[in-house]
Amino acid sequence: MSTAPTVTPERSNQTVRKTYPNYKVIVLNDDFNTFQHVAECLVKYIPGMTGDLAWDLTNQVHYEGQAIVWVGPQEPAELYHQQLRRAGLTMAPLEAA
C-alpha cells in the first residue's frame, strides 16, 4: 500500500496591513453662530488650528455652506465632532474621507 505525498500549502511571511479609514469633521453654516464663536471653537477644539486658518474656515462655512475642519482617524474625529456640536456649532454627520 503506497501513500500519496502530503502537500502543505506555503504560508506567506508577509503581513498585509490595512489602514484605518479617515473621517472628515464638517462644520455647517447656520443663522445663529457668530464668526467669532465658530473661529474660537475651532482654535479651542481642533489640534494645531491657528487663528488665521480658523478664520479662513469660518469664512468658507459662511460662503460655501460648509467646511472640512479636520480629517483623521475615527476616534479623535468623533471627539472633535462632539466637542464642536456641544459648543453649539451645526455639524454634518461624520463622513469617511
Curated annotation (Swiss-Prot):
Q: Which GO annotations describe the biological process of this protein?
A: protein catabolic process; proteolysis
Q: Which InterPro entries match?
A: ClpS, ClpS_core, Ribosomal_bL12_C/ClpS-like
Q: Which SUPFAM superfamilies match?
A: ClpS-like (SSF54736)
What Pfam families is this protein classified in?
ClpS
Q: Signal peptide position in this chain?
A: none
Identify its protein family: Belongs to the ClpS family.
Query: How is this protein organized at the quaternary level?
Result: Binds to the N-terminal domain of the chaperone ClpA.
**What job does this protein perform?**
Involved in the modulation of the specificity of the ClpAP-mediated ATP-dependent protein degradation.
Q: What is this protein's name? A: ATP-dependent Clp protease adapter protein ClpS
Gene name of the record: clpS
